[in-house]
């Protein structure tokens, strides 16, 4: 599907979807908790639906009610082996690998798109050192797990994916004894591990932080909080806020200003670029602004690179985004894809090993290829609002992965 966007005003209001990061964690913990959990905002993104489908195969029941979802936890061990289709969701795969191992489930994980190329070796190695047999097969790609995870020390690199750490945090309390997560280097995107800690607290569990990682008690049972309110997604709000700075104003609703989501840092980052952003009871409003160039290290908030890149393409003076080498292993090589997309629209963008450099010359328009990456497609749409000529976004349906309502909101009558 192709969508052509003419330069002009952004929608005046946008409601962001349920936080994908919070949603994965909440669904998995609710599936393992004592008692049912009610989520007032039902998931809609492809990634969260993938997690729900896998949990359903593992024995979880979901009852959809009007504007809510009731989660009934896993009732008993399902027949083995399970086939768990993670679709294109890295979070689903990396969270459920250790959870299935902790439950002693024999499971075959499958996926599609770029998921088979995304790294998981260090996580599998940690599981294999603690009682699990794992076999990775190609053509078709799948990972088969067998055995039951045993308590102990789990060593992980910190510079590959914080999702490894979060997956173990979710799983290790289920083991018969205490365990420890030990990081062999500094943890990138540490805020996402902090988000997992916060969600664990909401299900009644406190972890102990150590200089090298965490100590995790064993033999625990998660306690459902009953009703679990989740916030809106700050990584998606970032696109609307960038759109407001370029072609606003845009008022974003559905966000928790005190959220633990790392992507909440989009507010000070845009203000660092001289953006005018105001908070009110109605929401967060970004106004048209004369953006100025700046340098941003996105190692702690890598999902913000695409919306920041769209804004930096129009900023006065040079801008740089650094700390983003891991984005080469996302749904696309997000660095190369973002640079190529903006160049195709007439931008002066230099790709660096771990980031991008922008001359801030503005964009002409043309055809934007997001390489099947939902975040690149949304960045192209935001940039199109301030281009001199129309922009045609190819493969526009890829936004279904995280934000199915995106185009409906974006193309509303202004």
Spell out what each predicted region is:
Residues 1-414:
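Short, structured segments at the rim of ligand-binding sites
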